[in-house]
Curated annotation (Swiss-Prot):
Molecular function (Gene Ontology), one example: carbohydrate derivative transmembrane transporter activity
Subunit composition and interactions: Heterodimer of ArnE and ArnF.
Stretches of the chain found on the membrane's Cytoplasmic side: 1-5, 69-77, 123-128
GO biological process assignments: lipid A biosynthetic process; lipopolysaccharide biosynthetic process
Originating organism: Yersinia enterocolitica serotype O:8 / biotype 1B (strain NCTC 13174 / 8081)
Protein name, UniProt field: Probable 4-amino-4-deoxy-L-arabinose-phosphoundecaprenol flippase subunit ArnF
Disulfide cysteine pairs (residue numbers): none
One GO location term (cellular component): plasma membrane
Family per record: Belongs to the ArnF family.
Entry's localization field: Cell inner membrane
Length: 128
């Protein structure tokens, strides 16, 4: 069970990181490397902090993932990563600042991902 906790921790961190990165980047104007100077960073500090926090979330997620792999067989652990696809979709359509639309097809896709994860991690019924 310890491995699943680490795996879920990794999924939650990577999901939050992705949503934070999206917010930071969608609120940062288009730029080139030449545009980045102290004034630009100061003017867009919340966005840069969000991007840095998102990258840190990815790093922490990877650390959790290392521990998940230590305790879980790969054929059980790896499908857990797919949870983040469904969770990011739910976050993107639920949080008003993203203004992303939910469609039946996308929602069904997220549902199938969840169903697949459940099927892979369900123990087979023992035959007597």
């Amino acid at each position: 069970m310890k491995g699943y906790g680490w795996g879920i921790g990794s999924v939650v961190l990577v999901t939050v990181a992705q949503l934070i990165l999206k917010w930071g980047m969608m609120n940062t104007p288009l730029m080139s490397l030449a545009d980045i100077n102290g004034q630009f960073v100061f003017n867009h500090l919340p966005q840069f902090i969000a991007v840095i926090c998102g990258l840190a979330g990815y790093a922490l997620s990877m650390l959790c993932w290392f521990f998940a792999l230590r305790y879980l067989p790969l054929n059980r652990a790896y499908p857990l990563l797919s949870l983040s696809y469904a969770l990011v979709y739910l976050g993107a359509v639920s949080l008003p600042w993203f203004s992303e639309s939910a469609t039946l097809l996308k929602t069904l896709g997220a549902g199938f991902i969840l169903l697949g994860i459940w099927l892979i991690n369900t123990k087979p019924i023992a035959k007597d």
